[in-house]
């Protein structure tokens, strides 16, 4: 899917019309303007791209530390450095939006956070700070990579992973048990770039170690936004979905994923049985719009045969 420059225009528009946060402290450095502190209590924070005509390139140490109000932060597009413990114990921070001139996060920047979403606008090549973000977060994360005109956007899922210390009494040792496939996905980077081929090759770990819902979401994301997706891996994702269409129906209803439902319609992947399952899930959840869509697809793809009578 080609992405035009409107995405960057839209990002900048969000930083206009009095949406830019003014409750900041800053100072001028040799590397550009540094935001040293955000002292507001808004849940949605948009940081300025420029201060006094100079680009904001640094977010200082502890800039958002212990802020329990902030839930979403739009970072300066020219940002190149994030200091140590910048978001320390921002327990309610769920989403970051940033450009890719930032290649690393300072030590402990996300300690005590529970990030769920990250959007990165790829302005210069494919390198970004994504690796340092997902390595610091053990929770499941949804990632959106927006490319400039002519590129492909990606919508990715990084599953959860965690370690558990289990006592081996006979051997008198503690063994480390790993849970979830997320650890494998967090190793799919080379020189700060995501290796899509390696990412796709980890899918069997998701199938074996994570929930069916997680595997469905990951596979559908890769099919809908196929950045650097090989034919072999495309086929693998599609075959998985075809074998788990009831779970697909349940997930699309739960997420109200209309575009995902339509995508599977265009690919002729829905079966009559899975459409009926989707209708049942939608009816149970009182999601009338989704129910109507499933009914229309079934009517279109599996029309009832008219009965004929012979005299």
What is each PLM-predicted segment?
Residues 222-226, 267-268, 285, 297, ...:
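Residue-level signature of the C-terminal ends
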Residues 282, 294-309:
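Extended amphipathic alpha-helical coiled-coil/heptad-repeat regions
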Residues 219-237, 259-264:
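Repeat-mediated protein-protein interaction surfaces in helical alpha-solenoids
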């Amino acid at each position: 899917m080609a992405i035009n420059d409107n995405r960057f225009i839209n990002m900048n528009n969000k930083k206009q019309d009095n949406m830019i946060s003014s409750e900041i402290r800053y100072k001028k450095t040799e590397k550009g303007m540094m935001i040293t502190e955000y002292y507001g209590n808004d849940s949605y924070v948009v940081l300025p791209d420029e201060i006094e005509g100079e680009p904001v390139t640094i977010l200082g140490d502890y800039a958002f530390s212990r802020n329990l109000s902030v839930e979403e932060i739009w970072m300066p597009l020219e940002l190149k450095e994030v200091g140590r413990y910048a978001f320390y114990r921002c327990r309610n921070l769920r989403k970051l939006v940033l450009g890719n001139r930032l290649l690393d996060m300072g030590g402990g920047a996300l300690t005590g956070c529970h990030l769920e979403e990250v959007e990165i606008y790829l302005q210069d090549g494919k390198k970004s700070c994504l690796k340092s973000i997902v390595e610091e977060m053990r929770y499941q994360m949804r990632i959106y990579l927006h490319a400039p005109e002519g590129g492909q956007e990606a919508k990715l899922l990084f599953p959860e992973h965690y370690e558990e210390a289990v006592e081996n009494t006979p051997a008198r040792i503690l063994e480390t048990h790993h849970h979830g496939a997320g650890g494998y996905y967090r190793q799919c980077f080379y020189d700060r770039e995501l290796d899509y081929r390696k990412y796709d090759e980890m899918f069997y770990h998701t199938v074996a170690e994570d929930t069916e819902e997680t595997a469905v979401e990951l596979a559908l994301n890769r099919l809908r936004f196929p950045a650097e997706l090989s034919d072999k891996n495309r086929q693998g994702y599609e075959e998985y979905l075809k074998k788990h269409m009831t779970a697909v129906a349940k997930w699309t209803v739960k997420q109200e994923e209309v575009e995902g439902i339509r995508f599977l319609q265009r690919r002729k992947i829905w079966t009559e049985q899975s459409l009926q399952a989707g209708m049942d899930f939608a009816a149970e959840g009182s999601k009338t719009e989704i129910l109507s869509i499933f009914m229309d697809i079934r009517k279109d793809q599996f029309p009832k045969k008219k009965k004929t009578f012979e005299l």
